[in-house]
Amino acid sequence: MEEGAKIGREHEQQQQQHGRVNGSGRVAAVGGGSGGGGDEIEIEVAAAAGASPSRQHGGLHGDVQAPTWKRFLAHVGPGFVISIAYLDPSNLQTDLVAGSSHRYSLLWVLLFGFIFVLTVQSLAANLGIITGRHLAELCMGEYPKYVKYCLWLLAELGVIAATIPGVLGTALAYNMLLHIPFWAGVLACGACTFLILGLQGYGARKMEFTISVLMLVMATCFFMELGKVNPPAGGVIEGLFIPRPKGDYSTSDAVAMFGSLVVPHNLFLHSSLVLTRKMPYTSKGRKDASTFFLLENALALFIALLVNVAIVSISGTICANNLSFADTSTCSSLTLNSTYVLLKNILGKSSSTVYGVALLVSGQSCMVATSYAGQYIMQGFSGMRKCIIYLVAPCFTLLPSLIICSIGGTLRVHRIINIAAIVLSFVLPFALIPLIKFSSSCTNIGPYKNATSIIRIAWILSLVIIGINIYFFCTSFVAWLVHSDLPRVVNAIISSLVFPFMAAYIAALIYLAFRKVNLSDPFPTNSVSGEIEVQHIQIQEKQEDLGVHL
């Protein structure tokens, strides 16, 4: 017994010397016993995994030996939650306009855009896998006080802007299907979102499963519509693989479509969701996890791409036919609301009902996903406990969106969605640049740094998107200023405020791009997102190890 107690004390000293908690709530310990050999192992303690500590400990080695398809299925979920952002009412409206104005000639923009999205999202997923922290936590630990709080404010602003189209789309769908007032639809949308977010108490997988089902329902609805319209397969395939912009404003519309594909909250969300999975704390374990998450994300994005192609093809086929004067006028300025009327006039009431269901699912799933991202963003930047975040974050993101949409009403839906898109494009660089900086930092992720070619492609395409967004913002503002009916004095005052603001905006981006990453510990010592029974598991490990030696 004395020998056993001595071994136990030695093991406890090793735990105190080497044990630490990484950013995803995992206990990392350097084994120094007979079977340790200096290998690092990771014990999953994330609450969302839904397993007891003893089961999680036992699964470290058993999961690696499981069949490949089982390990892949264990990683399915985050990609589908991420893909919802590319099926929200804002993208739906953009696709409808692109199809009605240019038929199938801009489909290639979607294809290349989704390839870029897959690249960027894989960087976000790998960042979480390698560092054990999500993007918000890394920003909080890396940047000076005022910089990180500005990043937090901008990230929350992006979540609110991404939530607004979801609220509008859901409220419109309720009005189409149930003929209830717009404001009542807004309230119903908020209530349903709170209810679905309550599934977090049963684990992250339940939330991911719910959002995945909503995504598949939406895909089914639009594929049903596509079957009724029956677009020419040759024209769709040609538009998908051969860049041939046709018609007025085709170039600007293509640029706008590409620039709106990457959304900032997805970068925070993806780096967070990967931390809800059990992963062995080894080089092979990380490599396998990265591969599985990449394949899962590619599958989900492929489904999202098909749905977007279907939406463009539906509006492109309908508006290319011989229509009445009223329907032709509707096609010239297609919106979420007018599409319902157009489908009802041409394909019948059943078709418009299917569209209404798809819009409802699109808006509601968008609301849930963005609110979910807001929770991780607030947790990472504030350090508050999850139980508080679950209550505060949805109110912080949902209430402003609900108020804005209630005031705007149905007549301003198109304008509000456009303003929300501008805000998202404004916020995007402040999430995208830190992500690429962390992903390419040798001090932050060391030997697991992404390939140089991937980083270069990400930088080039990111600079293109940032340049597009800045260009459109400046040109839109100048056009508004030229055609404004305001007095010259007021225009001069507005200009004196906006242009210095844009100069400060560009200076902030340059600061983020050229600032050296100083965060050198790839396995953090403290992370609120994983404060789940860490001490209990450490004690349990000591007891189990002591029992083995005895």
Curated annotation (Swiss-Prot):
The organism's place on the tree of life at top rank: Eukaryota
Composition-biased stretches (Low complexity): 14-29
Compartment annotation: Membrane
A cellular component annotation (GO) from this entry: plasma membrane
Keyword Membrane: yes
Membrane topology according to the record: Multi-pass membrane protein
Annotated GO biological process: iron ion transmembrane transport; manganese ion transport
Main location per the UniProt record: membrane
Compositional bias of kind Basic and acidic residues: 1-13
Listed Pfam families: Nramp
Keyword annotations from UniProtKB, A to Z: Ion transport, Iron, Iron transport, Membrane, Transmembrane, Transmembrane helix, Transport
Residue numbers spanned by region Disordered: 1-37
GO MF annotation, one: manganese ion transmembrane transporter activity
Transmembrane annotation, as ranges: 72-92, 105-125, 151-171, 177-197, 207-227, 255-275, 292-312, 354-374, 388-408, 416-436, 457-477, 492-512
InterPro entries per the UniProt record, alphabetical: NRAMP_fam
Function field: Probable metal transporter.
UniProt similarity note: Belongs to the NRAMP (TC 2.A.55) family.
Protein name stated in the entry: Metal transporter Nramp4
Gene: NRAMP4
